[in-house]
Amino acid sequence: MTQISGSLVAIVTPMHEDGSLDFPSLRSLIDWHIAEGTDGIVIVGTSGESPTVSVDEHRELIRVTVEQVNKRIPVIAGTGGNSTTEAVELTAYAKSVGADASLQVVPYYNKPTQEGMYLHFRKVAESVDLPVILYNVPGRTVADMSVDTMLRLAQVPGVMGVKEATGNIDRAAQLIKAAPASFKIYSGDDPTAVALMLLGGHGNISVTANVAPRAMHDLCAAAMRGDVETARRIHMQLLSVHKNLFVESNPIPVKWALQAMGKMAGGIRLPLTPLAAQYQEVVRASLQDAGLLS
């Protein structure tokens, strides 16, 4: 199994102003991330606007990412959803083109029970020989996977870990304490990622890494080796970035930030809209404060 740890960018999906996919910019972003030390690419997750890409686009985004990365760092394909059958099919495709793992979000809208979540994720893991990272983000899905359900799933072959995005450090500590050593716990919440990693977490699936790949790599490396002072310093440097990349729904602010940095165009798909004018200077100031924009 490929080692997956450190700063894992929840990469955006670049789009032209008309909303069409911008593959040249995606390839350029990937190369920039690798040069800046990013430890893994998570493609077509929340930050990648997975709900508004078609099935064909979803597949092509995974294929192009795997091709561009070319085995330099791990690729984690966002292939989850609220249909178990579709999640299995998309995960099988990701495996066929060479992804290293899949990210499986808690099924949203249909609000499964804890048993339903368990059976859903077990079905995906048993159907496709590709490591599964669970993704718990109740702020998006409404349904919240319990620690007990995560621990049950940790016993399922093929389930390698979880992206825990609640930001609840007490919950993360309980999970880290009780989980087997083979089960990896990743933060999915930039403001609390340092704390989770200092408790024994294995990395951070990060929005901030989109704009600060080198800093996030250094932060994760420091936290995971127990270098509290370095991790604290970088965290404080990025504090306003962590906060202000969520002044509107992710990935609205981070896509605007990348456009301001000259990394891509600012296209985004409805029902998401471009960053409101009153927040643009807030985000710009955060980037400048962190030394990411002159």
UniProtKB/Swiss-Prot annotation:
InterPro entries: Aldolase_TIM, DapA, DapA-like, Schiff_base-form_aldolases_AS. The active site is at 135 (proton donor/acceptor), 163 (schiff-base intermediate with substrate). GO terms for molecular function: 4-hydroxy-tetrahydrodipicolinate synthase activity. Its main location: cytoplasm. Pyruvate binds at residues 47, 205. Keywords: Amino-acid biosynthesis, Cytoplasm, Diaminopimelate biosynthesis, Lyase, Lysine biosynthesis, Schiff base. It is found in: Cytoplasm. PROSITE patterns: DHDPS_2 (PS00666). One of its GO terms (biological process) is lysine biosynthetic process via diaminopimelate. Coiled coil: none annotated. The keyword Lyase applies. Pathway: Amino-acid biosynthesis; L-lysine biosynthesis via DAP pathway; (S)-tetrahydrodipicolinate from L-aspartate: step 3/4. The record marks 46, 109 as: Part of a proton relay during catalysis. Pfam families: DHDPS. It catalyses: L-aspartate 4-semialdehyde + pyruvate = (2S,4S)-4-hydroxy-2,3,4,5-tetrahydrodipicolinate + H2O + H(+). One of its GO terms (cellular component) is cytosol. Its EC number is 4.3.3.7. Homotetramer; dimer of dimers. Belongs to the DapA family. Catalyzes the condensation of (S)-aspartate-beta-semialdehyde [(S)-ASA] and pyruvate to 4-hydroxy-tetrahydrodipicolinate (HTPA). This is 4-hydroxy-tetrahydrodipicolinate synthase. It comes from Ralstonia nicotianae (strain ATCC BAA-1114 / GMI1000).
